Amino acid sequence: MLNQRQQYGRQGEQAAERFLKKEGYTIVCRNYRTPVGEIDIIAKDKTTLAFVEVKARRTESYGSPRLSITKDKQRKITRAALWYLKDTGQAGARARFDVVIVQGRDNSVELIRNAFDANLAAS
């Protein structure tokens, strides 16, 4: 059974998925788990694979969701993305990192394409 925070997180991922589909993305998979981390959503945006981190917050009482994408979190997402690319034989694929912020009781959605650079996250 999910607690309230987990339920809101799941609802946020569902809202993000609906939004991405409206934006023309094709969802490849959700909650891709690797030994080095998890990717919330992997989607195709035309010819580019997008590794999408979803941040869902009801309020900003714990700060802006943008601030929760720390360098450490970026490194984990990058490692998980590299694992996915290698595991699926797509090591040479064009890829980027997007963030979807789902916020408030109305689940307003903001998409940040190219939210961070994998090379900078590694440093």
From Swiss-Prot:
Spell out the InterPro entries in the cross-references. Answer: Restrct_endonuc-II-like, tRNA_endonuc-like_dom_sf, UPF0102_YraN-like
Q: Which GO terms describe its molecular function?
A: nucleic acid binding
Supply the SUPFAM superfamilies for this chain. Restriction endonuclease-like
Recorded superkingdom: Bacteria
Say which family it is in. Belongs to the UPF0102 family.
Q: How is this protein named in the record?
A: UPF0102 protein Dole_2298
